Structure formats: C-alpha cells, structure tokens
C-alpha cells in the first residue's frame, strides 16, 4: 500500500562532472561534452580551459604563401620576406607574381610555384629554376668535335691515305667521292710515333655563341631548337633534348650522334639565316632563313609539390602526370640517361584532377578526391605507383595536409582523415558532416600534439577546429588561419590582415596579445536518468585566471537561454562558484560566456527522483 509520505518522498543524488570532453555536434552529445563552443582547449585536461591568447607578430596586408626553413619565409604580394632564426630579415621586392604559391623546401632552397623560382636561405637570393637563351641577331657556330670540345679542319680527303704523311696530319677517308662529308667517312690523324693513322671519333657537338652558357651548368638537360641541322643534313637528330657535358660562357659541349650527308662541316647561324661549310672550306650550302637557335632548361607546370629522398616531386592535372626532379637538382626535370640520379615521370590512369601531395613514412603520396597514389621504390628504374580508391583530399584542401607523429592529417569529402600507412580513417565523427561537406577551402597546421584545421565555405562560413591527437578531442577557436605556418616550436596564423603566433609563451620577445572571448554550451544534462526527477541544485565551479566577468546561462528542455547568474573576478587566480536552483524540467543545458582566461573545474548537480511511481500508478474501480 502506498501512503502519502512514500508517494512524495524524494531521494537526492549528488553528481559531479570533473572530466570534460570536447566538441560533439552529433545527436548523442553527452553532458560532459559541448554542443557548441569557442576558444576552449584540452591542454589542461581533464579540466576545460580557454585557449592561450595569441601574440600579434606583425601586419601583412596580403599573404600568398608561407614556409619555414631555417627561418620564416613569407610571400607578401609580389615581395619575398625571410626572417632567419637568428633574427636577420631580408626583403626582396617585386621578386614574384602576385598569386597564391605552392612552396616546398630542399636543402637550403625554398622552391616557389607557379613562378618556378628558388629562394636560397643561405645566400638570401632568388633565382629561376628554368633558363632560356635565344640567338637573336648574333652568330652561332655548330660543329662536330671530340670529347674535349676540339674541332678540326682537313685539307685533303680521298679513298686512301697519303703515302708520306707528317705527324699530326689530318685526312678524311671517304667511302664515296661524290659525298665525302657524310658521317660514314672517317676523320684520321697520323701518329708518327706509332707509324699509323688514328681514327678520331666526333660524337660530340660544340655550340659557340656569345653568352650562350651563362645561364646553364654542366649536366643540365636542355631542349635545343631552331637549328638548320635538318636542312643541312648534319647529324642524325640535333634538335631535341640533350645533356650538357661542359659549359663555358661562350660555348657548350653536348653529345650528338653522327649522321647525315654533310656531317663533316660547320653550321653557322647569323641572325635568322644559316649556312653550312665543309671542313676544308670549299663546299658551302646556304640553308635559307627563319632560324633562331634556342636553348631552354624546361620546368614542368606543377599543381602540388612535396620533397622526399632528396628529390622534389610534383603532379600536373592537365597531363595527369607525376614528376620527380633529378636527384638533388630541382632545376632539371627531363634528365633521362638511364642512371640512378635520373629525373622521373609517369602518367597515371585514374580520372579526375590532383588535389594534393605529401610525404609520410618515407612514401610519396599523390591525392585525388577519391583515391591515393602511393609511390614505391628507391630509384627511377624500380619506381612503381600504386593507386587505391579511398577518401582522398577534398578539392581546395591541399593545404590541410600535415604530418604529425608520423601520421598524416587532411580534409576529405568524408571528413577529417588520418593516414598511418594503411587505409585512411576518419577522426571527425563528433563533427557535423554537413558542415565539413560544404567546405571549399581548408588549411592546416600543427603545434605540439594539436592539429589545427581552418575551413571556409562558399557562403564565407569560417571555422578553426583544433584536434587533440592524444585524447581524440575536438575544440573550436575563433576563425583565423587563412594561411598557417608550423615551425615545430610555434604555429603562425594569418587572419587576412595580421600574422599571429598561437602560443605567446613560445615567443622570444613579449608581444601584444589578443583578448579571448569564450563561450561553451554543454550537452543535455539529465538524459542518464529516464525516470521522473528534477535537479534541485547546480553548482558550476571554475578558476578565473585573470580579472573578468563570467556569465552562466541555462536552457530548460531545449527552450530559450535564461541567465542563471554571473560572477566577477577582481584578481587573478580567483576561484568562482556559480550555484543556482533550476526550474523543474526533464533536461537542461548550461552555457558559459565571458572574456579572458578561465578553467572549468567541475559541475555539481543534486538530482532528486520521485519514489512513488506516480506516473505509472493505476487505480482499480
């Protein structure tokens, strides 16, 4: 039998939350997690603290790219600025075009695309990766020569050698008197000491012109074009790609396969005209006009870049090709000589544009939205590219690629992913997928054990999400980070006008800091008790780390926010209590707002449950 005392008896249970999770935008957000927040951090876990104030570094009206290599490198409009770790600053105005850059480091150099330039952090100079030279109105002489670059003339030719030759005498032994200058003839020199004729092999080509070699260096692979060698029928194929054996200011040496009916002679270009003269000077062939000799060290157009094993790797969506530069030499991308230091290129069969490139665990990775291409091997002869269909990098999110603790983080169409050498896995289950799917641009950065991800949508909705990789917790900070640069010791974020340092304690000099405006909303409190109950008392306990006012708000059963109280800290490191007696409800949510620095220590709740089963009671008639 139920009496009136038992029917209305309340049993109180005191509950306390002392371990706080992070952002959970899903339907299953618990009371210890946050449905929404701004500027909180898990750095003092299990307590919930506000992020550190950011240190103002300097104003930058336009930032097209940033990179850290022995110092901070920034592309600001058309200017380059480099601040070495020792503090010396170098500024180079009008060094590049005013466009967004793709940057990668190799050795002491920072490579800049699409400008195809390199900044040397040692010499503080900018140079072009590619080079081109054109003859213009000048004179260019092209002659067959030996490996030392020596050219020869000959006075006599015939089917048989002279009877009484002198030491060093030259002779061209021909197969046909009608075509004496063809490549099948043999150029010979008499050696008196050996008393025999020695054959000279002219399988090199010497190109002489004023200033022709100033832009190039030995071992460069260049593209030679605009010669009259084809019309003169000299060499098997002179125009095309060739490797420079020796380079001087006014002449260069390259290999060239002998061929043609007028091989033994000199080809001279003067302006746009050309003529061929035989080795004895007697036969002359006018080759017409319209020629312009050009030498070019070509650099491919690349969308995304990465460095691995002393090579720069890149991908080009227009060609669907992956490139690698010559070993240790980012100025040469078309050097194919069959050796281990060769350049490398391969066409991929997957559809779609490239969306990013990265290096992780010693592998070069190229991304599309729906696949990852992984490169195996140690040299061009055994390189292999394997593709797997999985969640790749989302379009516009190439700068979200960041490696931390040998794990690669990036934004995909399926959310934020981590790649550890196998298949990518999502770490963004607690974030709303619809928001991430609307992202059109994303950048990433790292600091300590935290991964920072800035996102923006077509409607200019901006967010800065921070993932604690140790605890698997997400937080959200006020949205800056259109450009980020991680140095290992610091993370720099650009808000469109000002460059900020994420952690002022890591800066060597005191800087002006921003004011942290914070806000958090808890999940529904009361869902863990499905029976009749009410909360008789709630006490929020926190530490104010600096002076300020903290406001507490409450929402009953999903209703409007009502202010439940506020507290003021007149001194630093003040412990504050915000108690209140909530109205009768099934569930409630709490909200904290303010500015400054606080640490949420605990939320204590006294829950009373009705003991008489009033709701379930049935009465017989």
Which stretches of residues belong to each language-model region?
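Short hydrophobic/aromatic-rich beta-strand motifs
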Residues: 72-74, 108-112, 162-189, 219-225, ...
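Surface-exposed loop/turn elements that mediate protein-protein interactions on large endomembrane-trafficking
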Residues: 79-91, 119-131, 322-343, 375-383, ...
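Beta-propeller and closely related beta-pinwheel folds
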Residues: 53, 296-443
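Extended assembly-interface regions of large multimeric machines
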Residues: 1-218, 230-236
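Small/polar beta-strand repeat architecture
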Residues: 8, 129-130, 190-220, 225-299
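Short loop/turn segments that connect beta-strands within the blades of beta-propeller domains
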Residues: 76-77, 106-107, 113-115, 183, ...
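Beta-sheet repeat architectures centered on beta-propellers
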Residues: 1-70, 392-396, 403-407, 414-621
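Hydrophobic core register within WD40 beta-propeller blades
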Residues: 66, 103-104, 305, 357, ...
